[in-house]
């Protein structure tokens, strides 16, 4: 897979339909985002949901109703700048599309949510390997039994991403990722996956499977795929999200998100 270094060039490839893959490892140093697009009539409700669940839904950008632009994150058009989208109807995933131009409506509001792909550069700089990047695959993600804070129709369960590492690396990972609350921050769990309702660590709900090597433990971070579970629970007539792993690459630098 080709790797790009600057988000403007990368998004041009996406807009032109030349890149449709997962975005882990693309444009090191720049923030990636999850996406949820909802009708205006439920946007305030979803905003309350995000504020109730900041670990899973750290907002980094919100559009004006009807606009697909997020100027604070760069020269971005949400209709065309992600490699793959999922369309939900009545709470169920109905289709996958690569462009939203024909689906866009004047009442839609876009929410960009920080993604843990953004702190992976800092992990690697600190000597913590990120195996899904090294192996060229997507991070495994799991639906847990951790209930989200309920806001009106929006609830569901938390989704987590998993990265395998040694116990010593996990300690370092906690130190590093605690600096980045805008992209999920510190892990929510490490060790026994059954304690958060994950029955089989080698069968993720999203992403790609990744077996633990001897001496490794699973480390779990809250994930921006969580809003998709909230959309399912709300049974909205219409909503759009990114396909898990296929993120919006912004022009916001990760270093600007560090809390300390």
From Swiss-Prot:
It comes from the Bacteria. Its EC number is 4.2.1.-. Pfam families: D-Glu_cyclase. HAMAP family: Hydro_lyase. InterPro entries: D-Glu_cyclase (IPR009906), Putative_hydro-lyase (IPR038021), UPF0317 (IPR016938). It comes from Delftia acidovorans (strain DSM 14801 / SPH-1). Keywords: Lyase. Signal peptide: none annotated. GO terms for molecular function: lyase activity. The lineage of its organism: Bacteria, Pseudomonadati, Pseudomonadota, Betaproteobacteria, Burkholderiales. This is Putative hydro-lyase Daci_4977. Belongs to the D-glutamate cyclase family.
